[in-house]
Curated annotation (Swiss-Prot):
<keyword id="KW-0963">Cytoplasm</keyword>
<dbReference type="GO" id="GO:0008237">
    <property type="term" value="F:metallopeptidase activity"/>
</dbReference>
<dbReference type="InterPro" id="IPR037518">
    <property type="entry name" value="MPN"/>
</dbReference>
<dbReference type="InterPro" id="IPR027531">
    <property type="entry name" value="eIF3f"/>
</dbReference>
<dbReference type="GO" id="GO:0001732">
    <property type="term" value="P:formation of cytoplasmic translation initiation complex"/>
</dbReference>
<dbReference type="Pfam" id="PF01398">
    <property type="entry name" value="JAB"/>
</dbReference>
<dbReference type="GO" id="GO:0003743">
    <property type="term" value="F:translation initiation factor activity"/>
</dbReference>
<dbReference type="GO" id="GO:0033290">
    <property type="term" value="C:eukaryotic 48S preinitiation complex"/>
</dbReference>
<dbReference type="Pfam" id="PF13012">
    <property type="entry name" value="MitMem_reg"/>
</dbReference>
<dbReference type="GO" id="GO:0071541">
    <property type="term" value="C:eukaryotic translation initiation factor 3 complex, eIF3m"/>
</dbReference>
<keyword id="KW-0648">Protein biosynthesis</keyword>
<comment type="function">
    <text>Component of the eukaryotic translation initiation factor 3 (eIF-3) complex, which is involved in protein synthesis of a specialized repertoire of mRNAs and, together with other initiation factors, stimulates binding of mRNA and methionyl-tRNAi to the 40S ribosome. The eIF-3 complex specifically targets and initiates translation of a subset of mRNAs involved in cell proliferation.</text>
</comment>
<comment type="similarity">
    <text>Belongs to the eIF-3 subunit F family.</text>
</comment>
<protein>
    <recommendedName>
        <fullName>Eukaryotic translation initiation factor 3 subunit F-2</fullName>
    </recommendedName>
</protein>
<comment type="subunit">
    <text>Component of the eukaryotic translation initiation factor 3 (eIF-3) complex. The eIF-3 complex interacts with pix.</text>
</comment>
<dbReference type="InterPro" id="IPR024969">
    <property type="entry name" value="EIF3F/CSN6-like_C"/>
</dbReference>
<dbReference type="GO" id="GO:0016282">
    <property type="term" value="C:eukaryotic 43S preinitiation complex"/>
</dbReference>
Length: 285
């Protein structure tokens, strides 16, 4: 993909990237005013997907407002990421703050080499949550200057759209539901996973009841049939394989057991990491 096409292509951002940036901002070392790192994702013919990122340690020089990246660390983490996600490529870099920093041009030169033929993208995230909103802006550097003279870079805004797949929407809606609960000042724990399954099943049951009422009204000639709705129902029914009730119950119970096992293992790993973090803090003191 050429660099000019990268500027014109639509850019989609996954919510996971924003969560990773916010988490890195909350865990930033004392004295650091911002965090920055590498954006990863996939490029298609007509759009770009930012699907992942990782932070890169940096050093800020207050006297000249310069920022030095740990490029060796960035290269090593990128190499490890390529083993886990071989389809992801470097798309640019992110930074927290309210405006583009003075060192953006120098950082841009580094990511030009990493992106190859693609134009590096610069995602700016204002993690200060002004007005209780997370501001995200996407920039693309454009060369400017007079012919034969000194040339510079101008960071121009690029349209950005936050997209979510069905699996992402479940987590996003759960977080949104918890954020709207202002009953207590302390953050409440998320509801257990099985309760979420029950809520999702109840929601599906309500939608099926609504669908059955519509079909019965059409058969009883109480409502006029809609061809578009009929084709949508046919596509939905043909997309789902026909299972025997006993076979479906066995498959569902197996998936529930797998989910419980995954929850148990993740809880054990989380507890182990918390203990390791506390032990490391005690050693530092």
């Amino acid at each position: 993909m050429s660099r000019n096409l990268s500027i014109r292509a639509k850019v989609f951002l996954k919510p996971l990237v924003l969560f990773q940036i916010i988490d890195a901002y909350d865990r930033r070392p004392k004295g650091d005013n911002q965090v920055m790192g590498t954006l990863l994702g996939r490029t298609k013919e007509d759009h770009i997907e930012i699907t992942n990122c990782f932070t890169v340690p940096h050093k800020e020089h207050s006297e000249n407002k310069r920022i030095d990246l740990d490029m060796a660390y960035a290269s090593e983490v990128l190499e490890l990421n390529m083993f886990a996600y071989p389809n992801e490529r470097v798309l640019g870099w992110f930074c927290t703050g309210k405006s583009v920093s003075r060192s953006a041009s120098l950082i841009h030169d580094y990511y030009v080499r990493e992106c190859g033929e693609r134009q590096p993208l610069h995602l700016l995230v204002d993690a200060s949550l002004k007005n209780q909103r997370l501001s995200t802006r996407l920039y693309c550097a454009v060369e400017m200057g007079v012919p034969g003279g000194t040339k510079g870079l101008m960071f121009s805004l690029v349209p950005l759209e936050i997209s979510s797949e069905n699996s992402d929407l479940v987590a996003v809606r759960c977080i949104e539901k918890q954020s709207q609960q202002q009953a207590s000042k302390q953050m409440e724990r998320f509801v257990p996973e099985l309760v979420q399954v029950v809520d999702a099943t109840r929601n599906i049951q309500q939608r099926l009841d609504l669908l059955l009422r519509y079909i019965n009204d059409v058969l009883a000639r109480k409502k006029k049939p809609d061809n578009l709705v009929g084709r949508s129902l046919q596509a939905a029914l043909t997309a789902v394989p026909l299972f025997d009730s006993e076979k479906f119950r066995l498959m569902f119970n197996t998936n529930v057991r797998d989910m419980l096992m995954a929850i148990t293992l993740s809880t054990m790993i989380k507890t182990q990491l918390e203990i390791s973090e506390k032990l490391s803090c005690m050693q530092d003191q």
